[in-house]
A protein has these predicted regions:
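Extracellular jelly-roll beta-sandwich "head" domains, especially the C-terminal globular C1q domain
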Residues: 2-140
Length: 140
């Protein structure tokens, strides 16, 4: 995009508290409870979301740490306006005692008013998550 005087960067981040674990429950959104720095986006920890204020191409990243208590697995998907983006997912699984980070970054064309969240689409066994983050940066 354009740079120079008068061009403000557009970005936003929302995270969860470090070390606070949440149970992975099917068809719920990841709990993002701490608003981070933002400019040109709306951060809402009450509904675990980032809203896009300016149409454009964005780098969208999410990262979540899972702690597997028993043989378990989980699938996460980005949602846009509560619509699951099946092509944008991460998977994690394994035996008891495994800690795994589930993360990805995508470039997406987003519209003003789009609301982004991360949803737990599948979860089996005993699995908890923590240290979650969702970050958007407008690149064009």
């Amino acid at each position: 995009g354009a740079t120079g005087l008068g061009i403000l960067p557009i970005f936003g981040t929302i995270t969860s508290e470090v070390g606070i674990g949440f149970s992975a429950v099917v068809n719920t959104n990841i709990n993002f409870t701490i608003p981070g720095p933002a400019s040109g986006t709306t951060i809402n920890p009450l509904n675990n979301s980032i809203t896009i204020d300016t149409t454009g191409v964005y780098s969208v990243s999410f990262s979540i740490v899972f702690v597997i208590q028993a043989i378990s697995s989980s699938i996460l998907n980005l949602t846009i306006n509560d619509s699951i983006q099946f092509a944008i997912e991460t998977r994690v699984g394994g035996d008891s005692g495994i800690r795994a980070t589930s993360a990805r970054t995508d470039l997406l064309s987003l519209n003003q008013g789009d609301v982004l969240r991360v949803r737990i689409r599948e979860a089996t066994g005993d699995i908890i998550y923590s240290n979650a983050s969702l970050v958007v940066i407008k690149v064009d």
